[in-house]
Regions:
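Conserved ABC transporter NBD signature motif
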Residues: 62-73, 77-78
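Conserved ABC ATPase "signature" region
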Residues: 102, 106, 111-126
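Conserved ABC ATPase signature
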Residues: 130-134
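Catalytic Walker B motif of ABC-type/P-loop ATPase nucleotide-binding domains
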Residues: 155-159
């Protein structure tokens, strides 16, 4: 359940790289318990914005606040209360899943049961499997599990379903929804519009380092239709994703 109390606050964030403005005065708030999406083409500024919020990159000006903590003033405190699932992970192929989770927990000095963490993402039965033997979807689940070892206040997901087939993508969606239902605040980036509609309470559309739209997915679609916009193709009640899922089954194959 979301509340109006913001857990993420961005105020006039700016970041310049020589003659390129990556982030140009971005401001927004993310409510506690909300799933907030950032949409935009490559180079739009969404990744830089996320990195500033995570404390991985300094803004030239503006403020980034996570759970009341100014990121620039105390990045260590911020990193202790966030979980970060990266788009690409460098896990050791020969390590077992429980070993990987335990390793990351030690980095946070978190006292956890690796199997319990794996159970949150449905991988407890694979605790002794080696990373190299996982499917693409299972590797994404593990990367999310690792981001949960410190019981984060905010979970950052960077394109969590990139490269996955429709079956695996739906499984990751179900996992994100489950984490959200347990009260976590989630901020994610994605290139999949259907993913944003499925997961996000609100989305910000970014272009050239600026937010050009911010609302719920339904409201953004309604606003577009009110302009008289007509889709080029007839809108169908099903998609090719649905055809694929119907033919092959919804369960992720190992």
């Amino acid at each position: 359940m979301t509340t109006v109390n913001p857990v993420i606050v961005a105020k006039e964030l700016r970041k310049q790289y020589e003659d390129i403005t990556a982030v140009d005065g971005i401001s927004f708030e993310v409510r506690r318990g909300e799933v907030f999406g950032m949409l935009g083409p490559n180079g739009a500024g969404k990744t830089t914005t996320i990195e500033i919020l995570e404390g991985m990159r300094d803004a030239d000006s503006g403020q980034a606040i996570i759970n009341g903590i100014n990121v620039k003033d105390d990045p260590t405190a911020v990193k202790a209360i966030i979980g970060v699932q990266l788009q690409q992970n460098a896990f050791f192929d020969n390590l077992k899943l429980a070993e990987i989770v335990d390793l990351y927990a030690r980095l946070y000095k978190a006292k956890i049961d690796p199997v319990e963490i794996l159970s949150r993402v449905g991988l407890e039965s694979r605790k002794n499997a080696r990373y190299a033997h996982l499917s693409g979807g299972q590797k994404q689940w593990l990367s999310i599990a690792v981001a949960l070892v410190n019981d984060p206040v905010v979970l950052f997901l960077d394109e969590p379903t990139t490269g996955l087939d429709p079956q695996a993508r739906r499984q990751v969606w179900a996992l994100v929804n489950k984490i959200s239902e347990n009260g976590a605040t989630i901020m994610l980036t994605t290139h999949y519009m259907e993913e944003a509609e499925e997961l996000c309470d609100r989305v910000a559309v970014i272009e050239d380092g600026q937010i050009i739209a911010l609302d719920t997915p339904d409201n953004l679609i309604d606003q577009l239709l009110e302009t008289g916009f007509k889709p080029e193709k007839r809108v169908r009640e099903a998609t090719l994703d649905d055809v694929f899922l119907n033919l092959t089954g919804r369960d992720l194959r190992d």
